[in-house]
């Protein structure tokens, strides 16, 4: 999977710009606040129909403009195809091959990306919410079924929380509706949990050898999925549903008193263990960075396995955060295999032969200078 061209109109600090992309490495050089990260963000947004930096799409529209547009031409093994995204102050519209998609679940997955930025180090040391978002963003790109199940779960979770709040305040008294919601909640909670557990298992199988390679076999990495709803995965679907319903039933009074759902995938977490120790609590900064790098490289391989195409890699000012050995391992792994976009203030710190086959663009105040 390659991005051949990227066109922006009224996106952030860009007026109109077209980037003809190199199939291997594209390096965007410039001082801070010139638009390097905005350009990478536009590729991410084109892929996932949402920014990783803001939940407010209006912020993506250039000041005093009415709309923003992102368009990219992609090449796959079987041919080329354009993707288009229009953003207005009333909403957004996405197109695949010039055909409007009525649902985002039909759109997401045509362009797969892996983003690695300094804040991604928080996947290890940050909050459970960051790790849940990581699962949803990566798994959602390779499984439209997961995206749909997650959307249904979030819809029912919102309904259930609203009803629990009404019960807590005494505005509702009938528990029959809560039981109905719990039945629907359990069905999609099980589906989301199942797919997350399988994803983490697959990711671990790829991350372990990568981590061992980076550390010269001095460290062993393991990933542990920590679901809020604990049930026996070996059971059949009916037995698992019954087990989840039992948990929800036993805690119905607690949830009513608290006015919120206390169990479900929205409270899941992942732990990353290095040599049997939790990297979040006991890992050094170097171990946490190696773990994050191993996970990102494993994502790339997993996407290729699942969809038959390597994703596009977005490295947002992250090379400066990696020491020479980690940087070399990253660049050697992706060389001639993964189309990559790199933002940096200087290429002086990039000491790798990958530079011999890279295209450099200088970014200055929302303009691209070759």
Curated annotation (Swiss-Prot):
Entry's Gene Ontology cellular component terms: cytoplasm
Residues involved in ATP binding: 30-37
Entry keyword annotation includes Phosphoprotein: no
Domain of life: Bacteria
Single GO term (MF): single-stranded DNA binding
Entries under InterPro entries matching the protein: DNA-binding_RecF, DNA-binding_RecF_CS, P-loop_NTPase, RecF/RecN/SMC_N, RecF_2
Subcellular compartments: Cytoplasm
Keyword terms of this UniProt record: ATP-binding, Cytoplasm, DNA damage, DNA repair, DNA replication, DNA-binding, Nucleotide-binding, SOS response
Matching CDD domains: ABC_RecF
One Pfam family here: SMC_N
Biological processes per GO annotation: DNA replication; DNA synthesis involved in DNA repair; double-strand break repair; SOS response
Function comment: The RecF protein is involved in DNA metabolism; it is required for DNA replication and normal SOS inducibility. RecF binds preferentially to single-stranded, linear DNA. It also seems to bind ATP.
Family statement: Belongs to the RecF family.
PANTHER family cross-referenced by the UniProt entry: DNA REPLICATION AND REPAIR PROTEIN RECF
Name of this chain's protein: DNA replication and repair protein RecF
């Amino acid at each position: 999977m390659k991005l051949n061209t990227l066109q922006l109109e009224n996106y952030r600090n860009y007026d109109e710009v077209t980037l003809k992309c190199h199939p291997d490495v594209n390096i965007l050089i410039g001082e801070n606040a010139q638009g390097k990260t905005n350009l990478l963000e536009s590729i991410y947004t084109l892929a996932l129909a949402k920014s990783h930096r803001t939940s407010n799409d209006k912020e993506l529209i250039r000041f005093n403009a009415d709309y923003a547009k992102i368009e990219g031409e992609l090449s796959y093994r079987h041919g080329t195809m354009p993707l288009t995204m229009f953003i207005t102050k009333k909403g957004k519209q996405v197109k695949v091959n010039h055909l409007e998609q009525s649902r985002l679940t039909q759109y997401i997955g045509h362009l797969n990306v892996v983003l690695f930025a300094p804040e991604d180090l928080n996947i290890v040391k940050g909050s459970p919410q960051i790790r849940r978002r990581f699962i949803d963003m990566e798994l959602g790109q390779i499984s439209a079924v997961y995206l749909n199940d997650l959307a249904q779960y979030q819809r029912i979770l919102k309904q259930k929380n609203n009803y629990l709040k009404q019960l807590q305040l005494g505005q509702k008294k009938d528990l029959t509706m809560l039981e109905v919601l719990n039945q629907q909640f359990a069905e999609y909670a099980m589906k989301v949990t199942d797919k997350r557990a399988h994803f983490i298992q697959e990711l671990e199988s790829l991350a372990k050898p990568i981590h061992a390679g980076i550390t010269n076999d001095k460290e062993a990495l393991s990933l542990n999925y920590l679901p809020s709803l604990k049930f026996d995965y070996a059971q059949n679907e009916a037995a698992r549903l019954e087990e989840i319903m039992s948990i929800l039933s036993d805690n119905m009074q607690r949830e009513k008193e608290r006015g919120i759902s206390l169990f479900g995938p929205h409270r899941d977490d992942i732990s990353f263990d290095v040599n049997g120790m939790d990297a979040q609590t006991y890992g050094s900064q170097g171990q946490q960075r190696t773990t994050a790098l191993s996970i990102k490289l494993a994502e790339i391989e997993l996407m290729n396995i699942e969809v038959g195409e390597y994703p596009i890699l977005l490295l947002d000012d992250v090379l400066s955060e990696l020491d020479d050995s980690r940087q070399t391992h990253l660049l050697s792994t992706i060389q001639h295999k993964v189309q990559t976009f790199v933002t940096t203030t200087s290429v002086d710190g990039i000491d790798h032969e990958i530079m011999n086959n890279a295209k450099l663009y200088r970014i200055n105040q929302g303009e691209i200078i070759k």
